[in-house]
């Protein structure tokens, strides 16, 4: 039995300054916020959705969209029909379900359904219904504030495994990095592996200028979309994004050779993936295409080249833990390998938050991509992980934070 082919993603969404203004106004008016969505779904469905189980939320949304539509101002906020627009947005963009086109059109009076289709936010289907083409989620933080983040549909929304070109939304890893990053004002910041742009959005609250790099043109397109959509809260001029943000395509630090930054952040594609099949696709959203933990080693070793004096780098990483001479894998030293990547003269702090054995690591990342939905592919990939780790004598894999600082010439503690 051969693996089931994974359907490709639709084109990345796109906005003009004018359509970004229209969409932002519509989402704010719904209001498409975390609190409003939780109020619509209720605590049970909200918690279930947080656990990646959508059926309770689908039941609630279906109840709001049942029956004849009503899209006039007479429907108050407490009326069931007054929530149809919000329910349509939740159904399309948080659940990935088909919703009545008329309801979503009414929810977007400025952009309109035609504008949403043209922007790549929804695709039209049969029977007067539309389905979300992206995940568009409300996001709130103390800084910069209330926003909306677009990314590719999740495996739950797709109801199938993720394609290689997938662009992740805001997940636990990105929230971990955002929460750990020091927020002192800096002149120039760099986001390596920008993805949907969440770290860049945070950096703009305290950096004069941000450069964001990614190997994926699709990721850069999502980042541009999110910058345009949230320009008001970010303090950006939609017609002059380049005044404060530069989006650069390329591998790791290649697009910024010769430049210096006060702060570098990165949630790189650090996930270790067997490279036993040269024809296997590279999952650019999480796997840098190198063997083992080589992509993290390359990044850590090269970061001094882009750090200004007193500058700091903060990143998340995986590192392999060799079996060594001990029979107990849990006692093998975890930091010898990542410390060997740090250039002389750099100050380094390493924090290991988690450690997994080879089987546990394989299960975590195969489930993350929902490959269990394709049992033959899952079993083959699981065996590939075990063979790959065994071939290199890997006892475990560590996950954690790496903080680097280039000392200032005057011995001060740095800019960030």
Predicted regions mapped to residue ranges:
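Conserved class I S-adenosyl-L-methionine
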Residues: 186-195
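Conserved SAM-binding motif I beta-strand of class I
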Residues: 209-214
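Conserved SAM-binding loop of SAM-dependent methyltransferases across substrates and taxa
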Residues: 196-207
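C-terminal lobe and adjacent flexible extensions of AdoMet/dcAdoMet transferase-like proteins
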Residues: 386-416
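Conserved alpha-helix/loop element of class I SAM-dependent methyltransferases that forms part
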Residues: 171-187
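Accessory substrate-recognition/RNA-binding modules or partner subunits associated with SAM-dependent
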Residues: 21, 26-130
């Amino acid at each position: 039995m051969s693996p089931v082919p994974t359907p490709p993603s639709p084109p990345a969404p796109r906005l003009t300054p004018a359509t970004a203004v229209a969409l932002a106004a519509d989402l704010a008016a719904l209001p498409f916020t975390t609190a409003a969505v939780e109020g619509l779904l209720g605590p049970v469905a909200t918690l279930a959705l947080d656990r990646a189980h959508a059926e309770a939320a689908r039941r609630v949304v279906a109840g709001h969209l049942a029956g004849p539509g009503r899209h006039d101002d007479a429907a108050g906020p407490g009326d069931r029909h007054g929530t149809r627009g919000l329910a349509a947005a939740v159904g399309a963009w948080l659940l990935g379900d088909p919703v009545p086109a008329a309801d979503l059109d009414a929810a977007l009076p400025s952009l309109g359904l035609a504008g949403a289709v043209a922007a790549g936010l929804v695709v039209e289907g049969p029977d007067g219904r539309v389905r979300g083409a992206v995940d568009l989620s409300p996001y709130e933080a103390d800084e910069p504030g209330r926003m909306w983040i677009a990314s590719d549909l999740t495996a739950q929304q797709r109801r199938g495994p993720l394609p290689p070109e997938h662009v992740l939304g805001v997940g636990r890893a990105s929230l971990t990095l955002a929460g750990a990053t020091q927020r002192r004002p800096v002149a120039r910041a760099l986001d390596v592996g920008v993805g949907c742009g969440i770290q860049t959005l945070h950096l703009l609250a305290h950096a004069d200028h941000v450069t964001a790099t990614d190997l994926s043109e699709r990721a850069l397109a999502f980042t541009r979309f999110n910058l345009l959509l949230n320009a008001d809260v970010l303090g950006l001029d939609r017609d002059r994004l380049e005044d404060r943000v530069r989006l650069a395509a390329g591998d790791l630090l290649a697009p910024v050779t010769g430049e210096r930054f006060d702060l570098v952040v990165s949630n790189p594609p650090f996930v270790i993936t067997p490279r036993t099949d040269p024809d296997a696709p590279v999952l650019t959203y999480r796997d840098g295409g190198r063997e083992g933990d080589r992509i993290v080693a390359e990044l850590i070793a090269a970061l001094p080249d882009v750090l200004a004096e007193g500058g700091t780098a903060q990143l998340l990483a995986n590192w392999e833990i060799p079996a060594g001479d001990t029979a107990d894998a849990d006692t093998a030293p975890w930091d010898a390998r990542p410390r060997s990547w740090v250039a002389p003269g750099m100050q380094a702090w390493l924090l290991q938050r988690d450690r997994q054995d080879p089987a546990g690591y394989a299960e975590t990342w195969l489930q993350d991509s929902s490959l269990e939905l394709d049992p033959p592919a899952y079993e083959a990939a699981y065996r590939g992980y075990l063979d790959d780790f065994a071939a290199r004598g890997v006892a475990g894999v560590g996950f954690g934070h790496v903080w680097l600082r280039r000392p200032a010439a005057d011995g001060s503690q740095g800019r960030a």
